[in-house]
Amino acid sequence: RGSSGLYSGASSAGGVKTCPSEIEAGKILPLRMSWEDDWANYGVEENSVDVAAASRSVITHDLEDSLQKLSAVACEKVCVTVGTGFSPRVDMRVARAMGLELERHNDALFVFGIASDLGYEPTVSYIHSPRTKSYISPDEAYHSLLRTRDYLADTIDQISVEESACRLRNFLADHLVEIEEDGTKRWALDQSRVVPWAFISWDVRV
């Protein structure tokens, strides 16, 4: 699940006007609002924060409008984190072992391109986030990882469900190991998967 945030420092020309005392005290003020809402109704007005950030939440039905909203409320900078290809929910080592071709959406290209078209000069760096998922049993691991098929590319002929399931069982026989987690026996793959993210930012004062 993604998140969005608005930061206002001591040098800011403004703040989130619904509760400035909370901002001054260094507290977090949660606001439940969507990309489609009028943010001004929540006190988030134009040039009201120093930095506007969206982590894994900005890929919406109208990406350009979302990026414009972030840029409008920020006095200095916008920062977003988005995916670079395959779904972060899948382990590509498992997908390859199963013989699957998965759908790919490089959201970073769209964000970078739209920010450039809006007149900004975006920069990009990459975050490689290791993740380890554990399971209560080998059977749970098998059924959970079998859902890798939910992310199949629909333009490519794929191997059968039966064949990919057989390959998965063979893969787990070699790579699923017993671990201890909080004093309880669990099961996990012998290598953590690494999820790549693109961190894209731009100065709104260009």
Give the ranges of each region predicted by the language model.
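Short alpha-helix
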Residues: 103-125, 148
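Structured loop/turn residues at beta-strand edges in well-structured enzyme cores
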Residues: 26, 47, 72-73, 193
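Conserved beta-strand signature within the Rossmann-like core of class I S-adenosyl-L-methionine
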Residues: 74-93
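Conserved Class I S-adenosyl-L-methionine
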Residues: 123-206
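A short SAM/SAH-binding and catalytic strip from SAM-dependent methyltransferases
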Residues: 36-65, 71, 84
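Solvent-exposed polar/charged
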Residues: 71-72, 117
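Acceptor-substrate binding/catalytic loop of class I
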Residues: 96-108, 133, 154-158
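Class I SAM-dependent methyltransferase SAM/SAH-binding core
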Residues: 1-42
